[in-house]
Amino acid sequence: MTLTELQQKLREQIRVAARETFGVELQQVNAETPPRAELGDLAFPVSFELAKLIKQATGEKQNPRNIAEKLKTQLEDIDEVSRVEIAGAGYINVFYDRAKLLGMFAVPTQPDNEALDRPKKMVEHTSINPNKAAHIGHVRNAVLGDTFVRILKAAGDRIEVQNYIDNTGVQVADVVVGFLHLEQMDLDQIKALDASLGKDYTFDYYCWDLYTKVGLYYRDGIAAAAMNPEKVKLRNEVLHALEEGGTNPIAQLADYVATRNVECILDTMERLGIRYDLLARESDILHLHFWERAFTLMQEAGVIRKETEGRHAGCWVMPFESHTGTDEHESDKIIVRSNGTVTYTGKDIAYQLWKLGRLGLDFHYRIFRSYEVGHVLWSTQTETEAAGTDRPHFGGGVTVYNVIDSRQSYPQEIVARGVAAVVPEIGEDASIHFSYEMVALSPAACEELGIELSEEDRARPYIVMSGRKGLGVKADDLINQLEAGALAEVEKRNPELSEADKKATAHEVAVAALRYFLLKFTRNTVIAFDFKEALSFEGETGPYCQYAAVRTNSIFRKLPDETVAASDTLIKQIAGDSAMQSRVAEVLSGEGGTEIWSLVMLSQQLDEVIVQCRNSAEPANLAKYTFSLARAFSRFYHDHRILTEQDDVRRSVLIAVTKIIRTQLTTALGILGINVPEQM
């Protein structure tokens, strides 16, 4: 039995007691965690609610404290409850049987495998334009999305992870312009170039630099100048070729460029433990006529109209009220421009309808990448797949989370409202914008990465990146810098490790540092990334939490197997041996015992925190909890002689608690995407 299940058992007992004793049906029973363990493990303010309901039903006025006294005896009958006290005007404070619960928590619970039978939820994240290498802003998106996926799965949800590939957009077109008109390369020459590049300067890095050159090319070499309309025509020519697709040589060149960038980006994300189920390509949405189908559905539903006058004459728009009335938000409601081209909002509505299984069309599919652990990444395609292809069913989710930065809040609102207008029965709540703020760099981080700063920039709290200007930090460079810093720390702490083990450990520490730093701030917070702060082994950091888990493993490596086995046997005796139960209860009593018990109770809140994170869509809460658990275990480790304790019962309790913390802390870190190395 988990702590959550025990709490539910107590709630149900109160419902039964309220029904049988007072003839009142409670819809829900709220519970609170007392601020200190000596006040109880769980408090129910239900007596006050019952007093109101009884008066409404019978007109009789009852004292909440008297109601609490009648409920008290019912709760005391539960095996896992040691005692119940009534506090104040009628609070019911429940004290658990610490010894029994320790024995219960020491036995690992089997994971719930019912997710396959549950309605599917979908999370789209990362979704980087495939025109160059990923940067630090993309990493925040990917880490947030990946962690939220892990949270949903831990909460028992069935999840499909999608990565939208905008391979027909302006950004890809600009890089194609660069290859064709600046580099003077055809497809074969680009392939030869790609093959010649080394591991330190990969294809996505080359495209990064080329993209910056194209931006200057459009402005005749002057960054602040207006764009040359004649040169911008080259972009439009490429965009038309991408729309045509098929055997168009420019479209084929663009497909190679986009696909290679996707492969490089996937390699970057793999370094952070981030994977996907499906790559949904915009070219396939275009060529399989998803938009035409969505346009028809929108016309039939009467949610789109063609403007005949004013500045939007000739455009198809959704006539929703703007919440700000700004020109920018008015333009977001345009679905088809007067020249017949579809806006991003229009394409997003078509894609969202497909994700929710309401479009009436589907993609064709192919395997894009197979991972060594059996995970397969699929990609959409326009061509019909081979007959008998065994693949998962994609799309058809009941809820879709789109991880997109907060600047897209209003367009995402339009998408949700547009989909709900076409299919009213699913409502706007089926489309959830998982928004977040930007990530920048601290001035110190910029200097570590070799970015030149002016005196004015050095005085700023953070430096904002700009991909088009070439002012940015590639994700791989960021990871490499973190690995170098982590390696120096690992070499200092563990000089006896082999070079391979040092590098492997440094990688895990670097990933922990980066992921935790990006997760510990709430989504609506602008982050200024700082290497020194992220890599610190002290304070609220990934390495600190990691080190606490490493320490639990170190304890069990040092303990003799027979000592651990004896501890397990003794703890198992609690359930059927009253004398042993009393001895364990004695260890967990008093001020010192209560501190140990508080740590155990904190560890058992993980399930509740996971559910809270799922409901609030805020991974930062799990990061904060993980740090709290790591910090509490560190205090426990320093306060108790786990390895040298002579008393058998006390030693067994300390070992059992350490084992519980190891399980819960490792699980929490895993959901954050952080592995626990052997040594640090």
Features from the language model and the residues they span:
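Non-catalytic interaction-recognition regions
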Residues: 2-102, 115-680
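Short, charged, solvent-exposed linker or helix-capping segments at domain edges/interfaces
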Residues: 103-108
